[in-house]
From Swiss-Prot:
Function per UniProt: Second trifunctional enzyme acting on the beta-oxidation pathway for fatty acids, possessing hydratase-dehydrogenase-epimerase activities. Converts trans-2-enoyl-CoA via D-3-hydroxyacyl-CoA to 3-ketoacyl-CoA.
Name assigned to this protein: Peroxisomal hydratase-dehydrogenase-epimerase
GO MF annotation: an example: 3-hydroxyacyl-CoA dehydrogenase activity
InterPro entries attached to this UniProt entry: HotDog_dom_sf (IPR029069), MaoC-like_dom (IPR002539), MFE-2_N (IPR054357), NAD(P)-bd_dom_sf (IPR036291), Peroxisomal_Beta-Oxidation (IPR051687), Sc_DH/Rdtase_CS (IPR020904), SDR_fam (IPR002347)
Main location: other
This protein's UniProt keywords: Fatty acid metabolism, Isomerase, Lipid metabolism, Lyase, Multifunctional enzyme, NAD, NADP, Oxidoreductase, Peroxisome, Repeat
Catalytic activity: a (3R)-3-hydroxyacyl-CoA = a (2E)-enoyl-CoA + H2O; a (3R)-3-hydroxyacyl-CoA + NAD(+) = a 3-oxoacyl-CoA + NADH + H(+)
Family: Belongs to the short-chain dehydrogenases/reductases (SDR) family.
Length: 900
């Protein structure tokens, strides 16, 4: 038996185990002595059909290897309890449950049907509930249990075309967080994983070269470790792929407190302090936290009430005048408060409440004029389109939707019944889907609209006795993240709030202290009004889309994900013992954390970490070895042909590598700059190569040799908290002669990164030529022009010189980062331009460029140059798209040989 983490006689239930990740789980557990229930319905990826063969084949494979297993063919959402019954009947207990079964119904939200939404939620989320609920009494009585819920990056961050899947997967996180809290005293550990693994569900989405690294075998070791009897980890979330293992946790900003008096606690007051709400620095009244529960609102409101009246700032919220707002569950509590506040700002309000919308309408119309508000008593679950039709019939439009309606059916998980699960899911999650779906075509046609969805701290952090509510509210968050992505292209703004207020619904769970502090709904509504305003988008500094805010008691804060630096294993076979040995690295939040906000950011950061680990192994000696073959390959990558023998034939008497080959050892050494250590929240996916400079320290680049490049940071600067600038200096030496061959400076702009004061570097000595500005002389005819056609396959060829970033070859990845096709390497564009200058003006000693736009392989480039003494200022234009791609650019000619 491999390793020392034994599962001998433990009973493990795995759903969706007929193939992919589930199958690998089953084989791994069985190999370590577990008795395995292999569940698989045997349907298609879309969930149709039924075939017992898949589960039977896995069981046969386990038995042939000497293991113990039985098959089960039940549906997780229809007969989940029967899967657990199989374990009890065959083996007498259940110790480990892996909720892994899933289906996909990917389609844009505009085209998604309620059936497509419900089917995915049923299999993933309700299936997870059904299995966990059936296993719970056995695990409690045993005082032992381990449950893994399988989430997804799509659930954590949203993903285009997966509103159903995102909702279901994030719902599983909320469920797991609650079960972890309820199970703690019974030794039941519950965790969530968000794997990026090769499976039936991913093989049609991810490109082949990435899929090669994403074997499900790289996921299993963490799950084995988390479910072992010796492991105490619970209530945690992990991202993992291709040998990378990292932990995710919530990060809540210190936010801002306001005097909660509604006279001055207004949307304007919040806008005036927006920067403070969304920054993550500690403040005297509150610290940035990594919580497992809601804020200490009692402390915050006590401090807030001592503040003077709130400053209103210079911006008045006027954009809501005559806008039409639909607020659900507005007969009292938060909904009523929202409706009144919108009316106060000039909006027309549809007050929806299944019981009594009329008294609120009467109150609003008395305050703000007849016809300001109208009632609607349709059911949010079954009659969502009719609610929106009420708005259209009366006001001919709808601009804002606030999904607020809700119910509670709180019970400990042991006592929770299916009807209580479904009732809460329907009112919260399914009504949010249906109402958002009903306004979507209207907002799309208008090219504008706002949706504010309501989650809960129970959904974010889990809460004892609220498995149904936590799952529904977490699912709303995942759903909102996806429709925010899809809506952004249509002018539809979606955001999410987690309110803390005393209402009829929350009175039953509030403490005496909370009730005495009077957390009025009016302490939430000003933020809701602001989120529905155009002023926020205009004056906040960056668009506010798909964001999560916690609010109440005069306090507003933002909540986001934070990921640990993590651990990467580069071994072909990873064992859970390796996970155990490196647990401190996996859960290390002390350095190199990131705050991924999208699936692309997260996945790119993961794959970059893996690539860096592999590169570090390959470049342990830090040496760059090359031959004439590499020189020819580089020259060909810049467009040299067989007619240019001095560039393409090693026996030509004038054979040489083009001078810009100096950037190749620089590029190979950029990883040694360790930008992830220099800045906070480094994400490779957000890195832009801004400028490049190099100086040749020998008359020509050698055509073969062994070089070593030493890197050091010259500047590390914060750019207003929105980005970081890193400038690195790179000295390249010949190992044999010890002579300096070339010196490079690269400037990198990392969006979303931050540089705290203690990490700033300002005093690095820059090359004089690198920091000069070179403006093209306007109105003056260029001394030299050259038009160069790039080749459709140029990026495919140039990448063989060492830059294997898939962005330059993989259409799927290019589209994921918003490019229609793969782009040409910026250093290739530099090399093509510099070759034209080299052939016209002769050798140069120094070169500096700024990258201002991308080039697509096959585009035509025009190089324009103006000679000014020993300096040639130039500019490169992509004439196919009529954009400048290289600017602020110049070469300094060599005095000895240049064609002056």
């Amino acid at each position: 038996m491999p390793g020392n983490l034994s599962f001998k006689d433990r009973v493990v239930v795995i759903t969706g185990a007929g193939g992919g990740l589930g199958k690998v789980y089953a084989l791994a557990y069985a190999s370590r002595g577990a008795k395995v229930v292999v569940n698989d319905l045997g349907g298609t990826l879309g969930g149709s059909g039924h075939n017992s063969k898949a589960a039977d084949l896995v069981v046969d494979e386990i038995k042939k290897a000497g293991g113990i297993a039985v098959a089960n063919y039940d549906s997780v959402n229809e007969n989940g309890e029967k899967i657990i019954e199989t374990a009890i009947k065959e083996f007498g207990r259940v110790d480990v449950l892996i909720n892994n079964a899933g289906i996909l119904r990917d389609v844009s939200f505009a085209k998604m049907t309620e059936r497509e939404f419900a089917s995915v939620v049923d299999v993933h989320l309700t299936g997870g509930y059904k299995l966990s609920r059936a296993a719970w009494p056995y695990m409690r009585s045993q005082k032992f249990g381990r449950i893994i819920n399988t989430a997804s990056p799509a659930g954590l961050f949203g993903n285009f075309g997966q509103a159903n899947y995102s909702a279901a997967k994030m719902g599983l996180v909320g469920l797991a967080e609650t079960l972890a809290k309820e199970g703690a005293k019974y030794n039941i550990n519950v965790n969530s994983i968000a794997p990026l693994a090769r499976s039936r569900m991913t093989e049609n989405v991810l490109p082949p070269h990435i899929l090669k690294q994403l074997g499900p075998e790289k996921i299993v070791p963490l799950v084995l470790y988390l479910t072992h009897e010796s492991t105490k980890v619970s209530n945690s979330i992990f991202e993992l792929a291709a040998g990378f293992f990292g932990q995710l946790r919530w990060e809540r900003s210190s936010g801002q407190i306001f005097n909660p008096d509604p006279k001055t606690y207004t949307p304007e007051a919040i806008l005036n302090k927006w920067k403070e709400i969304t920054d993550y620095r500690d403040k005297p009244f509150n610290k940035t936290q990594h919580p497992y529960q809601l804020s200490d609102y009692n402390d915050l409101i006590t401090k807030a009430k001592k503040l003077p009246p709130n400053e209103q700032g210079s911006v008045k919220i006027k954009s809501l005048c005559n806008k039409v707002v639909v607020v659900t569950g507005a007969g009292g509590g938060l909904g009523k408060s929202h409706a009144i506040w919108f009316a106060r700002y000039g909006a027309k309000v549809v007050v929806n409440d299944i019981k009594d919308p009329f008294s609120v309408v009467e109150e609003i119309n008395k305050l703000y004029g007849e016809g300001t508000a109208i009632p609607d008593s349709h059911d949010v679950v079954t009659e969502a389109p009719l609610i929106i039709q009420t708005a259209i019939s009366k006001f001919q439009r709808v601009d804002i939707l606030v999904n607020n309606a809700g119910i509670l059916r709180d019970k400990s998980f042991l006592k929770m019944k299916d009807e209580e699960w479904f009732a809460v899911l329907k009112v919260h999650l399914f009504s949010t889907f249906s109402l958002s779906k009903a306004v979507w075509p209207i907002f799309t046609k208008q090219k504008s609209g706002f949706i504010i969805n309501t989650t809960s701290t129970s959904g974010i952090y889990g809460n004892f006795g609220q498995a149904n509510y936590a799952a529904a509210k977490a699912a709303i968050l995942g759903f909102s993240k996806t429709i925010a992505l899809e809506g952004a292209k249509r002018g539809i703004i979606v955001n999410v709030i987690a309110p803390h207020a005393e209402t009829a619904m929350t009175k039953t769970i509030f403490s005496e202290k909370e009730l005495s502090n009077h957390f009025d709904a009016s302490q939430v509504s000003p933020l809701v009004v602001l989120l529905a305003s155009e002023e926020l988008q205009k004056y906040s500094g960056r668009r506010v889309i798909g964001q999560l805010f916690e609010v109440g008691g005069g306090w507003c804060g933002q909540t986001r994900w934070q990921r640990s630096s993590g651990y990467v294993s580069i071994k072909e076979t990873i064992e859970p013992e390796e996970i155990k040995e490196n647990w401190n690295h996996i859960t290390d939040f002390s350095r190199n954390t990131i705050n991924p906000s999208s699936t692309e950011e997260s996945s790119m950061a993961t794959l970059q970490a893996v690539q860096k680990a592999h590169s570090s192994k390959e470049l342990d000696d830090g040496l760059f070895k090359y031959t004439t073959k590499d020189c020819i390959l580089y020259n060909l990558g810049l467009g040299c042909t067989s007619k240019e023998l001095k560039y393409t034939y090693e026996n030509d008497p004038d054979f040489q590598v083009l001078p810009t080959f100096a950037v190749i050892p620089f590029m190979q050494a950029t990883a040694t700059l360790a930008m992830d250590n220099l800045v906070d929240n480094f994400n490779y996916a957000m890195l832009l190569h801004g400028e490049q400079y190099f100086k040749l320290c020998t008359p020509t680049m050698p055509s073969n040799g062994t070089l070593k490049t030493l890197a050091k940071p010259l500047q590390v600067l914060d750019k207003n908290g929105k980005a970081a600038l890193v400038v690195g200096g790179f000295e390249t030496y010949d190992i044999k002669t010890k002579k300096l061959i070339a010196y490079n400076e690269g400037s990198f702009f990392i969006r979303g990164a931050h540089v705290p004061p203690e990490k700033e570097v300002r005093d690095g000595k820059r090359a004089k030529f690198a920091v000069q500005n070179f403006e093209v002389p306007h109105g003056k005819v260029p001394d030299f022009e050259a038009e160069i056609s790039t080749n459709k396959d140029q990026a495919a060829l140039y990448r063989l010189s060492g830059d294997f970033n898939p962005l330059h070859i993989d259409p799927t990845l290019a589209k994921a980062v918003k490019f229609p096709t793969p782009i040409l390497h910026g250093l290739c564009t530099l090399g093509i331009s510099a070759k034209a200058l080299f052939e016209h003006y002769g050798p140069y000693e120094e070169l500096k460029v700024r990258f201002t736009n991308v080039v697509f392989p096959g585009d035509t480039l025009k190089v324009k140059a103006w000679k000014q003494g020993s300096v040639v200022v130039f500019q490169t234009i992509d004439t196919t798209r009529n954009v400048i791609v290289l600017d602020n650019a110049a070469v300094k000619l060599s005095q000895a040989k240049s064609k002056l």
